């Protein structure tokens, strides 16, 4: 049987699958269930400085290409999130499943404080969300838009905590490699790529957007090629592990993401139809693919596309 164990920044994962932030990462019981269903690590929903109700309904819609959402970073605030994370960590520890805690902030100067509060729960890693695409009307241009602003946020978080940090980047920028280099230079231990892709759906019969917020973030199968390209590009310019997220719903999808250069593979929208059981399904399919193709472990696949990209078919 192929070995799925991953050493990620000194953190042991039983397999490379990660519950992506924003999907089921809202309560200890739900995150524990994901762990029991076979996820390698769980990421909590992003927490900010204070409670947010998010956008008005409708905020999400499943469609043939995946999911579009404009939930709007609904969260209880970092202080209220702290006991949730503490309880989650307590439940996950006996299962050998690490906890990644996601944070965001509306202002540069707030990131350090949110990180300090969340660090009290002792998560295994803090994921810094600087790239949510559907709150620009509230917070302005995302910090992920430029290398300078992304680096400034990373610097604030790095000064505030000693925990490993992963910065979550956006796909809709022209200089993704430059931004990746900038956050690593300021202390990012890893990079998460990608966040959802800005998009819009219209109800032609009603002649209006399907979301109350008008636009939202696309996820699911439709964005997998975008995510693969982003992970491939980032892995060529920085020497830190990448959590590749976007459009993963099968073992083949996971294998492709690892071949593009990802160390871990985030799973999100696939849970809309498959529920937490999707983690076991993907792991089984990944192992079967590796067995059939002669891969003994994940390292033998990681980044393989870089070595074969110019081969003649």
PLM segments and residue spans:
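Alpha/beta catalytic cores of nucleotide-metabolism and tRNA/nucleoside-modifying enzymes
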Residues: 1, 218-239, 243, 249-313
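Short low-complexity, flexible loop/linker segments enriched in glycine and/or proline
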Residues: 57-60, 141-143, 206-209, 279-283
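Alpha/beta enzyme core
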Residues: 32-37, 106-243, 251-262, 267
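Short gly/pro/ser/thr-enriched loop/turn and capping motifs at secondary-structure boundaries
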Residues: 48-53, 133-135, 198-201, 271-274
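N-terminal capping/small domains of soluble enzymes
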Residues: 1-99, 104-106, 282
